[in-house]
Amino acid sequence: MASKLHLDQSKVAKARAAAARVAEDTQQFIDQHTTVAVERTVSRLLGIDGVNSADVPLPNVVVDHLVEKNALSQGVAFWVGNAMVELGKNPQEVAEAVANGELDLTTVKAHTEDEVRAALAPVVEASLAKIRANRKRREDFLAAHGGDKEGPWIYLIVATGNIFEDIVQATAAARQGADVIAVIRTTGQSLLDYVPYGSTTEGFGGTYATQENFRLMREALDKVGEEEGRYIRLCNYCSGLCMPEIAAMGAFEGLDMMLNDALYGILFRDINMQRTLVDQCFSRAINSYAGIIINTGEDNYLTTADAVEEAHTVLASQFLNEAFALKAGLPAKQQGLGHAFEIDPAVENGFLYELAQAEMAREIFPEAPLKYMPPTKFMTGNVFRGHVQDALFNMVTCLTGQKVHLLGMMTEAIHTPFLSDRYLAIENAQYIFRTMKDLGDEITFKDGGIMETRASEVLTKATDLLGQIEQLGIFETIERGIFADIKRPRDGGKGLDGVTQKAPGYINPFMEAMMEANLKAMNGGN
């Protein structure tokens, strides 16, 4: 695409190369380590499900057992597979025996890696086939209904705490015109080191992410999608201490979109950086394999940092998220890189700065389904001004080709949206998307004008920052508080005790198979 902003492509290339080197350097650490969340994910992918007599999820029971025996460094797949060879049990039976205190995985007679892999192979393939079937179901539905929607996807949230009430609100929103339904997680779930089991009706500020809740909402949206003749995407959150587990649950239940950003968890949830960067890699490999779009959390930086002064940190983070995604085999078309309309309305020419930032993101990441967040920080409760702010936000999306459009609510900062609030917000967006549909193709920006100058300044600062990050490494960068003005220590935060260095002979057959398929797909099947 031709650049309206006349961006310096040498700086874009320099920034992208620096981000790639940061990701490569970090990947060396990632490849040498596993975590309790990664191993619980492997357990789930092996088909281990359910809870013990104390309602502890069986994946936690098995992994905690191996942690107690100081044996996690071999990987749960090795120990479960070894027990399968020796005892003739399937993974679920092995897990139940561990839960009942009947089996110590570390005392089972050891078998060769080849024997273990052979026992695991049909189980691994069955899980991968289930994930592929969900991906095909989505693709077949889209093909049967005229393909994907052109223009922005209208993204709406539900957050009642009760999955059954969420379904009522989600189906109503879909009928009103929503393209993506995001079920907000209950407050604090990102800090739980386990995933609750079953359907849930009590949450705070959101609803628990559980596999059963995923299934129920997917079923409801499929039904309304058939009625409406269009596919309704389902979004949830695989971030926090159970990042890859929730990615696997989403892959099993046919989710389409996942919030997934280690930096967000580090900065805003104080999750240990070593832990969550390892978890993120596996979660992104799963998302790629399942055809799930990830959304990243750069928009959150602007809730604590100034959107004018710190815009370059958003762009730098987008470059880093792109690089980390590619290392996990996640292609550009599944990278919903985030940013937000968060400049103070009192800033003169603030709209031009917003438009420049959004256009710059679109030009630098042309294939990415960019995730664009509405104004929240400067929504005051004045619903009339708020509706105007949202209209300006809608205009930027339309003019610059943003894709995942998180619909702003005029009642932001007052209460959780009513059905009527959503209706008015959808009507606002649809009017602007319709009446300005091709305006972006009709206009150019003034050479040397405010927007071109602004974009050039932000790109230059982001390129310089990425050069600095390359010298420091990602860990020290975060320790210094470069992102969002928030400092986090390398050995602090939640979850560090769940990080383990891999031992010789470690196996994770799912990561191996998914990465092989992901990289092959990214390279055009070669």
Q: Model-found features: residue ranges?
A:
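Long, compositionally biased, glycine/small-hydrophobic-enriched stretches that function as flexible linkers
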Residues: 1-166, 172-177, 185-213, 240-246, ...
